Every structure is written in C-alpha cells, then in structure tokens.
UniProtKB/Swiss-Prot annotation:
Superkingdom assignment: Bacteria
SMART domains: TOPRIM (SM00493)
Pfam families: RecR_C (PF21175), RecR_HhH (PF21176), RecR_ZnF (PF02132), Toprim_4 (PF13662)
Entry keyword Zinc: yes
InterPro entries recorded: DNA_Rcmb_RecR, Rcmb_RecR, Rcmb_RecR_Znf, TOPRIM_dom, TOPRIM_RecR
Gene: recR
Function: May play a role in DNA repair. It seems to be involved in an RecBC-independent recombinational process of DNA repair. It may act with RecF and RecO.
GO biological process: DNA recombination; DNA repair
Residues of the Toprim domain: 78-173
Protein name: Recombination protein RecR
Species the sequence originates in: Xanthomonas euvesicatoria pv. vesicatoria (strain 85-10)
Family per similarity comment: Belongs to the RecR family.
Coiled-coil portions: none
Keywords assigned: DNA damage, DNA recombination, DNA repair, Metal-binding, Zinc, Zinc-finger
MF annotations from Gene Ontology: DNA binding; zinc ion binding
C-alpha cells in the first residue's frame, strides 16, 4: 500500500467514530471518485484550522475575537446558558426561542481524563459571573455522569456569585447528548427548566 494512502487513512481516523475500515473506505472513495471533492475538503479543512479560533467571551468557534452572538446588542445579557460544545449551542439556537448568551465549556469535568475546571475555562466563567450582569445561569450539560457532575459544580459556582442556577428538565433522556435530541423535546426541556437546588 502507498505511504501517502496510509497517511490519508490515518488522517481520516482522527474523526470521532471513524475506525480503520471506515477511514479506508473514505480514502478510497476520495481517490477513486471524488478527487475534486477531496481538494475542496483539504482546502476547507486547512482554512478552518488556520482561521477559526475561540470567542474570548463564550469560547464558541469564530473567525473574529468576539462571535456574532456575544457581539449582538439584541441578546439578553442577564441569561447565560452553559453548554458542553458548540454543537449543543447550535441545537439550542435552532430548537428554542432562547435569546440570551452562552458559555461553551468545550467538554465536561472528567478528572480521570485530566479535565478539570481550568481546562473548561471555569475561571473565565467565574469572572463573567462576578461582573454582575448575569442573573440566571441555565445549565445545559448532557445527562451523563460527567455532565451531571459538571452541572453540580456549575450550580455551586453560580451561587457563589449570587446567580440563580437552573437546569434543563423533562424529556432529556438520562445518558443522552443534546445534539441528538429532537427539536420538540429540546424546546420543551428548555422551556420547563427548573432551579438547581
């Protein structure tokens, strides 16, 4: 097998859920049938890796220092929704009428994997809460063991800054991930969130 082909297969394997066989199929498909698509993919990937960074306020992906949501004057700055990933933020934006701001953890607490508060930017979140503008923190972490532990930590952080923590409710399956929940369920869960005790 060609060394370049082996490198292409290994490159595809960095994607989540892509094993050896899937990576091999993708590599063969690009080389056999989609060379132009492969060129576009390589160019788009190169541009994104070089030019897309994180918003200094919410940690979402953006090409500028501050993302369009944080820069918008029409958003409710008293509400801050904390999510695990940009995909979760997108799911909430599409499924609900939420008009507040976000903070994206880019993960969840997982001490066994070496992911603690610092890796999730919780120092920056604490500074944002300390500024006094936020009155409600909507905790929208996934209903997994790590997500629940993260939610508990976030609720404590909110209370330290006199911010009311609330949590998504009803319809969110235990062990489920936000980006895979249908819009109706997510909209209902968002609308019926409850205060975290």
């Amino acid at each position: 097998m060609s060394t370049l082909l082996e490198q292409l297969i290994e490159a595809f394997r960095v994607l989540p859920g892509v094993g050896q066989k899937s990576a091999q199929r993708m590599a063969y498909h690009v080389l056999e049938r989609e060379r132009e698509g492969g060129r576009r993919l390589a160019a788009a990937l190169g541009n994104a890796v070089e030019k897309v960074g994180h918003c200094v306020q919410c940690r979402d992906f953006t090409e500028s220092e501050i993302c369009t949501i944080c820069a918008s004057s029409s958003r409710d700055r008293q509400q801050l929704c904390v999510v695990e990933s940009p995909a979760d933020r997108l799911a909430i934006e599409h499924a609900t009428g939420y008009r507040g701001l976000y903070f994206i953890l880019q993960g969840r607490l997982s001490p066994l994997d070496g992911i603690g508060p610092r890796e999730l930017g919780l120092d920056r979140l604490g500074e944002r809460l300390a500024a006094g503008e936020v009155t409600e923190m909507i905790i929208a972490t996934n209903a997994t063991v790590e997500g629940e532990a993260t939610a508990h930590y976030l609720a404590q952080l909110a209370r330290q800054h006199a911010v009311r923590p609330s949590r998504l409710a009803q319809g969110m399956p235990l062990g489920g991930e936000l980006e895979y929940v249908d819009r109706g369920t997510l909209s209902h869960a968002f609308g019926t969130r409850s205060e975290v005790l």
